[in-house]
């Protein structure tokens, strides 16, 4: 009797890992004011994304929808494949917001203990105190903590549920330079273990240094989305820097291809579409020295892409 080779069993399909954030066609208005106008945003697990835009661009309104604090008029949003509120209830999402949410008359440790009681399972209190850099003030009343210390307490509270997604809205407000550095070192360490981070900030240097990806909003829409290098390349031109005592800014601004001139002490910076020609002029026609050519910085790109972002957008919500 002829034998038949066994047919190998077909392996069950592997379920695709849902993105941390999947927002499609988000629209939100407040009366006659259009705050968000058709935002599409997908954030993969493990990304660190800077969410930038001037006041009134729609960032905070978008973040509110990602957190389930408000509902879009149109469009859909999912967090790890669930509704935002379900994801938060399951401890998958935490947020560090700018203000509010702290009881002034209890200690830092008591605040964390109270917050931990809301979850079935949390990281140890001492662990999140250390991670947030506030172990030494654990017994201090919240009301006597500085603004930066209170912000780090909010960070510790957000870490309790060990969330897969951490949303930060101006997280380093009130922190000094050293506090900001320590905070971002902690964020980077957590992200290295796979946590997704989405943060809004007005400190463009933070976005430049710590983000894998930058999403830029203007007038309720996403106008740019990419790596820092990709975003910088969206604006043409270079910046020519030089030391030029007594520089005639009017004459420099009148040079062909020069868009603007900035001066700080003896240093000048010329934003130009023809950096070679400008550098040649400075070296041959002036007493300039220490001439260097650089790409546009993130601030220049930010201003170029957002422009005067204050018409027909949200006024009270940034």
Regions found by a protein language model. Name each.
Residues 229-234:
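Short acidic-hydrophobic catalytic motif
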Residues 1-27, 308-318:
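ABC-family P-loop ATPase nucleotide-binding domain
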Residues 14-15, 103, 116, 270, ...:
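A general boundary/transition motif marking the beginning of the first structured unit of a protein
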Residues 30, 116-120, 132, 235, ...:
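A broad structural signal for alpha-helix termini and local helix breaks/kinks
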Residues 18-23, 28-199, 204-218, 224:
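ABC transporter nucleotide-binding domains
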Residues 213, 235-237:
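Short, flexible active-site loops
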Residues 237-312, 318:
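Short, charged/small-residue-rich alpha-helical element at the C-terminal edge
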